[in-house]
Design a protein with these regions (language model features):
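Bacterial N-terminal signal peptides that target proteins for export
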Residues: 2-16
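Intrinsically disordered, low-complexity repeat segments enriched in small/polar residues
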Residues: 6, 10, 27-28, 164
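Bacterial N-terminal signal peptides
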Residues: 13-25
């Protein structure tokens, strides 16, 4: 089990060169059994709505997406980042960011990730859905589902896990029974959830495609798709 930084990758974004040098010196390996990401990139459909698209991350690379991070300005989700980690090296992290917020201050951070002590190493995003505001112009919620990679390259979906007791008076769009294995982030004007989009069996997300709508000053995130690759074990 492991704990990733709860401040997320602000440090990675600000100190990328230093972090890269440290990871090169000593990046702990997940296990003795390395795995590979193979084959072509398979994109999912969009959860939410299409717009001007930006790919965040390296779909053909060796990193898997383990979380997403979004920030707003003036109630508009103008910033989105994917959090990724090498599938064989715990701690070899990186972030890909699309920031359309401009120079003005931002607020209202929203983050979903497989980064708590409750999740095993090599747990990556396999499915995602977004929640929209009431006129379907801005993403106001994120939820992810994941899969855990074993030493043979098999990807096992995380089973639903519910707390023993739930608060039936939950607000802001949360279900009475929240799946603890499907991290969720909500803003107060989350109005309606869009469809789940999911990587094909045996695949994990290696990048995301973020869609921004025609709103300006700043533009708002309207949808997200996953870019997926197959996981395979290596021969001894």
């Amino acid at each position: 089990m492991h704990t990733r930084s709860r401040t997320h990758r602000q440090a990675v974004a600000l100190c990328a060169a230093l972090a890269a040098s440290l990871f090169t010196i000593a990046s702990p390996v997940f296990s003795e059994n390395a795995v590979l990401l193979i084959g072509p990139v398979t994109p999912t459909e969009i959860s939410g709505f299409a717009g001007t698209s930006f790919t965040l991350g390296m779909p053909q690379g060796a990193h898997g997406v383990y979380g997403l991070w979004s920030v707003e300005r003036d109630d508009k989700p103008c910033y989105i980042a994917s959090m990724t980690e090498d599938v064989n090296k715990y701690g070899d992290d990186s972030s890909a960011i699309k920031n359309l917020c401009g120079a003005n201050p931002t607020s209202n951070e929203m983050k979903v990730e497989f980064g708590n002590v409750e999740f095993a190493q090599r747990t990556f995003v396999r499915a995602l859905r977004v929640c929209m505001n009431n006129d379907n112009t801005r993403v106001k919620g994120l939820q992810i589902r994941g899969g855990e990679i074993d030493g043979n390259g098999n990807v096992s979906d995380l089973r639903a896990k519910y707390a023993e007791s739930s608060d039936s008076s939950s607000s802001s769009g949360k279900s009475m029974l929240a799946d603890l294995n499907a991290p969720i982030g909500l803003r107060r004007n989350c109005d309606n959830w869009k469809k789940w989009v999911e990587c094909p069996q045996g695949r994990i997300a290696t990048a995301i495609t973020a869609h921004f709508g025609p709103e300006s000053d700043p533009a708002s995130l309207t949808g997200i798709a996953l870019q997926c690759r197959m996981v395979s074990g290596t021969k001894s």
